[in-house]
Amino acid sequence: MEKIKPTLNGAAETMLQSFYARAKYSKSKNCKFYDAKAVEIVDKLDYDFDDAHSDSTMGNGVIARSIVLDELVGDFIKKNPDCVVVNIACGLDTRFYRMDNGRITWYNLDLPETIEVRDQIYNEHGRVSTICASAFDPSWPEKVTVRGKMLFVIEGLSMYLTAEENAKMLSIIRDNFDNAYVIMECLAKKWVNKEDLEKSIQKTGAKFVFGADSFDDLGDVAKGFEKVKDDNITRGMVKIYPILKPFQNLPLINKAAQKMLIFRKK
């Protein structure tokens, strides 16, 4: 099979770094997280992953957030087995294949250049399908089946958007879905403008421009929503490195960790 050569840049290119991190870790001994699809597909891509391979800061963060997000999404699906999930800025994410209970409906939404790569690799249809659109396109909800409680997963995106852009993205969800629940990954505020700490991300040209330490920090960005829970990826890091467990609940550690903010439409 001829390898697929992705042509991406900036924030869109960061999806390749995250994808590689999941594949690399899944091949490691005694891994606490396994992404079978990433392992299967990584060698089909014609892309220089050297920077991602050596960027342990980025890699550990990706695995920790994957562990915690799998837990959060899995819990939602367990409570709502016929739910609809919209994965915004999906990149090459494979969570559907780990979460599928045979009943959920799952949409992977991203920009045209990303969906083009994704469609070549996955050829998704049926209960899992793609939506080729910007998260700011007010028409994308027309392509989504509305049924019961709706979960919107926003991973690896908010930190690359301005507050105004994040507000616009969330307003589209708010204005179109009455039973909307959102899990939104946010950069801790102390890391805004510090993308140089993740060398593979820095080399894509993407910038960390937005962060929030809690739902309350979102303010008008999440207008029309109410808090369900503030969470973070600390326990994911502890699963990777159990030696960190004694420090898990230290305020300083929790403040610096990537946040998982869970909220719903009022």
Identify the role of each PLM range.
Residues K189-A206:
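Short, glycine-/aromatic-enriched active-site segment of Class I SAM-dependent methyltransferases
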Residues M1-V86, C90-A133, V146-R147:
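Rossmann-like AdoMet
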Residues N176-K189:
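Conserved beta-strand signature within the Rossmann-like core of class I S-adenosyl-L-methionine
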Residues Y160-I173:
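A short, conserved alpha-helix within the catalytic core of class I
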Residues F152-V153:
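A conserved beta-strand element that flanks and buttresses the S-adenosyl-L-methionine
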Residues A206-I233:
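Short alpha-helix
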Residues G236, I240-K266:
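Core SAM-dependent methyltransferase catalytic element
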Residues P138-R147:
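Short amphipathic alpha-helix with an adjacent loop that forms part of the alpha/beta core around
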